[in-house]
Regions:
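C-terminal non-catalytic regions of proteins with extracellular/luminal or membrane-system context
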Residues: 1-284
Length: 284
């Protein structure tokens, strides 16, 4: 019998490349890339608990490690992370540990956000040049998302975080650590400088994200879904989840075909104007 030792470093490098190239950059108002050495503040619970995958059988994959964004951005990335913001989160997390759920299909879709106040965020904006806001979600087998806060919709805590950080920071980047699209109406409300779906990239996920943030790799991911303004805007919305039959109300106009043909104004992605593609300049 021949024994073969896998060169795990090569697999890790390929995974890192796939993560970086798969990032979907929806908006970039000359915020990214950010050169190493920049002063940055990290907001959001998910920065400390990167979702490497969804739940269910696909989530029960053993990995050797999963590093979180502060470790990678402040370590390999060379960014100067705001110590006061990190310390505030560390103290809060000590009293609000990660909630894992109690069994199969019981893992929460999200983790509650640390409350923020104007004085704290305003002071952080005076110390740091750029804010990274990390919003995380998980879902999976027997645990599909629903049209509720903390799932498809943002929670009140996430809305407050976005409102304050985008108000006081001249440069703000929202990183969506998710496995599926979210409601995106908040982009128009808070106008962050950059928005990116970083997805769930396994154990090398945060390293791949770093390669996009610092300009080593140009994000070339494409959305697998059309993002409507509201769930009710999808043509199949009124016929979803029937117990006795499947009724394909959209006929041949599935996905983008419906919006492109009949309702471009109901679309949040570049069929409309919420994410102007002229601002997606990226130099590596």
């Amino acid at each position: 019998m021949k024994n073969t030792m896998l060169e795990m470093s090569r697999y890790a490098a390929l995974a890192r490349q796939a993560v970086a190239e798969g990032v979907v950059l929806l908006k970039n108002e000359a915020v990214l890339p950010l050169a190493p050495g920049g002063r940055a503040a990290l907001f959001g619970y998910a920065q400390f608990h990167y979702y490497k995958s969804g739940t269910g059988s696909g989530g029960l994959v053993n990995v050797t490690h999963v590093q979180n964004l502060p470790e990678i951005l402040g370590g390999d990335g060379g960014y100067r992370l705001d110590a006061e913001v990190q310390a505030r989160y560390a103290a809060w997390l000590a009293d609000h540990p990660y909630e894992m759920g109690t069994g199969w299909a019981q893992e929460p879709w999200f983790q509650p956000e640390m409350p923020l106040d104007e004085e704290f965020v305003r002071a952080a904006a005076q110390r740091a040049d750029t804010a990274f806001i990390v919003i995380g979600r998980t879902a999976g087998e027997d645990q599909d998302n629903t049209n509720t806060p903390g799932s498809f919709l943002l929670t009140e805590g996430e809305e407050n975080m976005l409102a304050l950080v985008c108000r006081y920071f001249n440069k703000s980047v929202v990183l969506l650590n998710v496995g599926n699209i979210l409601d995106m109406q908040w982009v128009a409300r808070y106008n962050p400088g950059a928005v990116a779906y970083i997805w769930q990239g396994g154990q090398e996920g945060c390293r791949g994200v770093l390669d996009v943030l610092n300009g080593t790799v140009s994000p070339s991911g494409k959305l697998p879904d059309t993002i409507a303004r509201t769930p009710a805007d999808y043509p199949a919305a009124d016929h979803y989840g029937a117990d006795d039959r499947n009724f394909y109300a959209e006929d041949i106009y599935v996905g983008y075909r419906y919006f492109e043909t009949f309702a471009p104004e109901k679309c949040c992605t570049p069929l409309a104007s919420d994410f102007p593609t002229r601002n997606l300049m990226y130099s590596c």
